[in-house]
Swiss-Prot record:
Part of the 30S ribosomal subunit. Contacts proteins S3 and S10. This is Small ribosomal subunit protein uS14. Keywords: Metal-binding, Ribonucleoprotein, Ribosomal protein, RNA-binding, rRNA-binding, Zinc. Binds 1 zinc ion per subunit. One of its GO terms (biological process) is translation.
């Protein structure tokens, strides 16, 4: 888990736009962020398997 201070720091508006980066609002993870859904891959997988993300179906072939 990310430190609370780092999460709080990322939420604030940065002095320069280049310093802003995406962070998962559920767990605070900065990497593997899926822009379309606004969460990280781990939270996405958890929510998709429980059926909480609309329009996502498990593929099978």
């Amino acid at each position: 888990m990310a430190k609370k201070s780092i999460i709080a720091k990322a939420k604030r508006k940065q002095k320069f736009a280049v310093r802003e980066y995406n962070r998962c609002p559920l767990c605070g993870r900065p990497r593997a962020f899926i822009r379309k859904f606004g969460i990280c891959r781990i939270c996405f997988r958890k929510l998709a398997s429980s059926g909480e993300v609309t329009g996502v179906t498990k593929s099978s072939w």
